[in-house]
Amino acid sequence: MDMWKFFDITHREHILCNPMSLEKLDQLITLLRLKHGARVLEIATGKGEFIIRLAERYRQMTGTGIDFSPYCIAEVRKKHQTRVPDAQLSFLEMDGAEYLPETLESFDLAACIGASWIYGGHRGTLNALYRMATPESWIVVGEPYWRHEPEGEYLEAIGVTRSDFGTHYQNVEVGREHGLEAVYTLVSSQDDWDKYEGLQWYAAETWASDHQNDPDVETVLKRVRENKTAYLRWGRETLGW
């Protein structure tokens, strides 16, 4: 089935499409202290809660949000018009990896939160954002990390390899390779993770009940239930973010 349809179904109850609380997001936004007229780029903007909240707090910023999902782009454009209609924001439906700004090193904040697969991993993401950000800018990323060594069965179940993610410390060290220094980190709590995962189960089951004739019902339920088993059996104790 269409991957964006699947993502839209399983995240229809989410405000944030990652395992982070709104309180932590607001804390981050407060710490950024964007200057007047700051230029912001968010790759994989999702439902756009981060960039919309930035615009609500920093009214004089301009922002560009990129996402490949037509569902997400439609939702974030609606948020823009209802919550910050006067904000200078634009949203592009495209592959983030193909986005190139008119001028490199032009953004005061460059972000890709929870979608490093776009650039082939954490290192590739930092490299891409680094090239688009000004020397004194903020770079914001969200990346999984191993809390302890993952079991082989878990890796097979979720379709990743051990080398796809590092430890929390290793994620920071990759930044240092680019001359970046981590000044703050937000780590998802068990409650953050349980809410993120649990809302997917709820969304899938309620959607399936309401759309019993949809040809993708079986696919959605099978995938979500398999992911639920992997999370409860291994992921809850193994994967951080």
Name each model-derived stretch.
Residues 101-110:
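A short acidic, Gly/Pro-enriched loop at the edge of an enzyme's catalytic core
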Residues 184-241:
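Conserved Class I S-adenosyl-L-methionine
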Residues 109-121:
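A short SAM/SAH-binding and catalytic strip from SAM-dependent methyltransferases
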Residues 123-138:
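A short glycine-rich, Lys/Arg-flanked "PGG" loop and its adjoining helix->strand segment in the class I
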Residues 49-98:
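Class I SAM-dependent methyltransferase SAM/SAH-binding core
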